Amino acid sequence: MLNLIYTMYLPNFFKVFLLTAFQIIFLSNLIHAQSNCENDVIVQTVNGKLRGVIENNIYVWKGVRYAQPPIGNFRFKSPQSLNNWEGVIDADKFGAVCPQTRNIDSTVKTSEDCLFLNIWSPGISNCNRPVMVYIHGGAFYSGAGSLPIYNGSNLANKGDVVIVTINYRFGAFGFLYVD
């Protein structure tokens, strides 16, 4: 069984992880940031602009796409790089949770379009901060980076660090690769 996990699940999981890490690196090295009102902040990423919010003195971007939606022709494929976009995308709400056999909460929205990450940062200056990427547990069949237990506000505030949580696909949707 462990051999099956190592040969089937982990290679695709690491592709998701590397794609996520690539996006995070560019999000943590913000090119431009501006605040339009008291509680929102717009950042320029390599793919386009994102509007986050300020919560408890922490800059937060929720539901940030890190790959193309894994639907249709991409359903059983490796994650596809994100396309650039025009305009500003609101990043103030968590993205959908990936479908799973063990339901987290009946009120939580699940969807195959679930490749989102969430970012908490103590600031938006150009200074270099450590980035901690937290990949939730769940034995590859349940969980989400948007669960309250993974809220990065406190750690970002106390550790002067950027916190990132991700959603990733489970079961056949996440690890059955058909070429």
Regions found by a protein language model. Give the residues of each.
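Residues at the start of alpha-helices and the adjacent loop-to-helix junctions
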Residues: 12-13, 25, 44
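Hydrophobic membrane-targeting alpha-helices
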Residues: 25-33
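Bacterial N-terminal signal peptides
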Residues: 17-26
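Non-catalytic accessory segments of hydrolases
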Residues: 9, 33-179
